[in-house]
């Protein structure tokens, strides 16, 4: 009895060991081979793919297998597939009998389950390996459904050359997805894994046709297809050689490779948010412009289109893709490249100053020759307006007003604001950039720049959705993975910029004259309203244009990836036409809704754009952000006293108060006035004081160059002698005579036009100017010595 009990225990132990061995004999995961990176459009169509790390075209596991392939592969390889548990013993007995009769391997008995095991193990086949495959195939069938087994087979079967898996084979041999293949095409693919090294497209074509036709006949016998379908399928040609896979978004595919971990995606295949038709049209447009630009040595351009409504990327062209021309550097993704932004940050400064109560939309900004700590910004046209409304300075992209505005706003504050806009490339302290920050002194990426404008547009679009409040998630990054998890809504009473500020900024950005339209585009009812801004970096290295409607943000860049500058490479000439052609590919939309509860009607001085003071002559009522109430009153209107004929200024010391006429007068500082009056014919210069009247202490002269306490350098001429610097002063009286002195030494006299060429020695000097009325201007400047 005890002996029998021991036997039972030993048998149970043996059975348990065998059961454990059986259970753990199947490796997990079954396949650890690398797969190709695959990028699909939002409709599931293939956009781009790259070869796997082991040099094979092997797509990730698909969700299902096309019905045609199921019928073909089961009929050809394993007709009792649905009736066995991994091993087809009927086929085994048949194979043994046939092989014994032929005295060689004339027939096999591998089921599809066994073939999947063999593909996963990749070991040399022996009788023992065959038995192991049978064992593991049974174990395989225990854990996997028949559909899962077919899916694994279809994804890992060899199809000749370096093509692995049905999806890769379908694209390589037929240029389209497997579900779109005909019976003849699917039968051709189904027979390839049987002997992929001997029979494949481009090799042994006649044998491949025979095998395909035999399979089609079997499908007729099994009543899967009819005879007519089989005959038509036999007439189809077989592919002659592998085809290149689509490369409609190669740069986005590479971006996905780099960001795969951050995106928390566990497969190398993603369905993107890209609109397939728009992407192809944008590729065509990019190639068209590349052909045009290449004649001028401009090799690279990129375009990004984002759907504002949901924040999804609908088109992504990182460069004009020309892999066969390596000198073009078309592999560089310019959407993620760090480049100088030129003037494209100016709207963000304009919006920040509106939002924080520094200016109103049309506040006059100084536009005169400027020196700030040795830094001398220049307008692109090298001219000066004297003073210009802030919104017009933005639309004309003037550099000096932008620097003046940043000087007022403080570059440290603007730097912090850009950080909140999520510009990832500002990795140095604010002092490193200084005032050049507004003129392209930093680096940005197209991605970050587009996301900044996307956040503003989304915020304004959501004005009604959140009852005037703000969702901080609006400033989150755009996304390109279709099912990517969206950030949670965080509703706050305030945001980076308020609705009224954004609306005012977009209106200012809309007023730019479009290239080729000569300012008349607004007269056409079909014209799309677009807020847009161009940018050109120093040395003509980068041309930018970014634009938006309530539905889309479009950002384009034109230039050379290696940073070489080219004549004519400007935002308005190169990038803007490209951007507007991109907008023509997109549906039109209405303009942004006016956020009336976030705007306030206040009286504004027509001439200065400041909040109107009581003595402003002409007032306008404008919609401005409520914080505009905090801005300063107009500083340029002054109450002056005139004689009865309104010819001269007078004082009570020389003229009867009862006969005086008191008038409000628009008066700019001398330097601003000097340039402003040449561009504005309606500007009236202050009348002179009547003879014998004591003048009030108002500035009548102002130095244009050099500014007070400026350090200047006077270069040496070719002959080795020191050259001359042109000193320039503005005087309110056009007929004034000015006497010039340097260090109390007389150097010359000017009348009407007050410029003089001087060559002071290196060192510190005192400049003294005196006009015919005894008015004096004294200031200090320093001439630098190059040798020191």
Predicted regions and their residues:
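Soluble, non-transmembrane domains of envelope/secretory-pathway proteins that act on or interact
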Residues: 1-5, 485-491, 529-788
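Juxtamembrane regions of bacterial inner-membrane/periplasmic proteins
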Residues: 2-295, 312-314, 368, 404
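Short pre-catalytic segments that frame enzyme active sites
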Residues: 38, 45-59, 168, 197-201, ...
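Residue-level preference for non-acidic, small/hydrophobic
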Residues: 44, 73, 116, 149, ...
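Acidic/histidine-enriched alpha-helical segments
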Residues: 88-94, 136, 167, 206-208, ...
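Conserved catalytic neighborhood of penicillin-recognizing serine enzymes
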Residues: 101-125, 179, 242-258, 359-414, ...
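Glycine-rich, acidic and aromatic/proline-enriched surface loops and short helix-turn segments
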Residues: 115-122, 155-162, 179, 183-195, ...
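A penicillin-recognizing enzyme superfamily signal
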Residues: 272-293, 305-307, 316, 324-337, ...
